[in-house]
Amino acid sequence: MITQILLTQTFIMFILMILGLILSKTGLLTEHGSKDMVNILLYAVIPCVIIRSYITDFTMEKLYGLLMSAVLAVAAFAVAIAVSYIIYGMRKPIDNFGTAFCNAGFIGIPLVTAVFGNEAAFYVASFASILNLLQWTYGIVIITRRKDMINIKKVFVNPVTISLVIGLFLFITGIKLPGVINSTMAGVAALNTPAAMIVLGYYLSCVRIRDLLLNPSLYLASFVRLIIIPLLTLLVLYIIPAGHGQIGMITLIAAATPVGTSTAIFAQKFGQNYERAVCMVCLSTLLSIITMPVVMYLAQMWIM
């Protein structure tokens, strides 16, 4: 059942990517427009998704589940960072960053909610928050090779962290937002999948097919990101008792997502190989249509 849902959702995402590619090729979506869409996603859509996920009745069971999801997320990232560093070290910063940090926000959250319902975003939000924290600390060191480039303000003052704090406050206090605000946030949150995939389609239109499909090193990076890291994460979840059941599956879905779009954003921001980063994002996203359902099929036998 989970595999079938994932297969359907990843195919929908593929269609949306093609739509983005067509819009770009016909001149209806420009570079400036794609950057605006990324800003809308980062500063409006993702915060609405996270805050809405915490608008639920407080129970100790949910609090325990939230803490366990954070612990499992740390374990998953420990695997990803270790594998990426062993394979790439500091000599290939884009490959290291891209394989270590997945697309939990734009792909993981919508896939998790499609499989387990909107309430499951409650748990995957902690994964996205830890991802954000690691990107702005360890990720900066990878990209720049300089520890002094870490911006403490951006680590804690960013849309993901702020929305997480607001969401936790609403969850713990039990404060309910007015219906009109909740409905508005729901509408904005619904943009997550289509907007993110259309942007990825734009990225796809910017690369040469030859560069994308005939570069063995890109396939290696995709193999690391989509196969090695998810399977090792699955093994860790199998060993840890708390890794079994729904929270374990939620963690694995997020951990099995392709190279994050943040790889391209960080590469551009810090003067690294932006074109390679875009190729990594696009190829791994296309291949994830096949790999994610396969990984989840194996996971159902191991941790469900």
Name each model feature, range by range:
Residues M1-M304:
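Alpha-helical transmembrane segments of multi-pass small-molecule/ion transporters
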